[in-house]
C-alpha cells in the first residue's frame, strides 16, 4: 500500500514538472517593434558628402512629424544597408527595388512606399508626367562606334554595385537576354551614377549604365553633356525606389511612417527636400508583389 501511494505521488510530481517544463518551452511570438528613435538609411547615388548635406533637412522634418529623435545613416553600399536592416541598426531605408527584394526575401524588410517622379525626355528636360517607374540606359560617347548592345563585347563598361537595379541588374540582364555574357564585357564598378558618366567623359570607360536620365544631374557642370554622349539602349520599366522598414516594425508605426512621408511630400518645403535628395516627387503605397519582375531580372543575373 505504501509502495502504491509513493508511486502515485511520484507520477503526480512527474506530470507537474513535465507540464511546467513544456510551458517554459512554448515559443511566444516576438512583440512588434515600437521605436523610441529612428535611424534612416540612404545609399549614395552621388557623392556621399553631398548626399549627407541634402538629407539633414529631411531628418528634422521626420523627427517633427513622428515625434521621436531621427538620425540619418549613409551606407557604403547596398549590402551594408541590407545588413543594417537585418541587424536592426537601420529602421527605415531608402533602397532600390533589387535591394528591397533581397532584404524582404531574407526576412529583414517590408516595403511601405514607392516613389513617384517626373519622366525626363531624351534631351534631359523634365516632363509633367508623374509615374511610379523609371528605366535604365546605356550611354556611350557621341563619337563612339558603339551603336548596339552587341557592340559592347570586349568593351570597358562602368556599372554600379551588384545590387543596383538600374546601374547593374537591369542593364546586365538585358545584355544576357541578347546573348552577351558577363565575361564578354570588361566591367568596371563605380560608386555613383554621376561618377560613371564622368568616367565615360574622361575616356576611362567606353560605356556606362545609369538610370534615365542621369545626364541631367551633370548638365549644370557640363552643359554640353547631351551633345557629347548618346544613349544606345533603354531597358524595360523598373519600379521606382522604395521606402522600406525593418520587418518587425509594428503595423501602427508602419502606418505612421508612411503617413509622415506622404504628408511631408505634400508640403512645399518637404517636396523640395525629397526632390533634391533622389528626385522623388511624392510617394504611393506599395506591396511586395509590385517587385516580382525585379526578382525575375535578379535571377537572370544570378
Predicted regions and their residues:
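A ligand-binding cleft/hinge motif common to bilobed small-molecule-binding domains
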Residues: 94-108, 173-177, 201-202, 206-226
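C-terminal motif of bacterial Sec signal peptides marking the signal peptidase cleavage site
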Residues: 15-19
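Short beta-strand->loop
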Residues: 109-131, 186, 219-237
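Extracytoplasmic small-molecule ligand-binding "clamshell" domains
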Residues: 28-101
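Bilobed "Venus flytrap"/periplasmic-binding protein-like clamshell domains
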Residues: 35, 40-63, 75, 131-197
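Hydrophobic residues within well-ordered alpha-helices
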Residues: 85-86, 152, 200-201, 257
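An extracytoplasmic/periplasmic, membrane-proximal ligand-sensing/linker region
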Residues: 21-22, 32-41, 46-63, 245, ...
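Acidic, polar ligand-binding/catalytic clefts
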Residues: 83-151
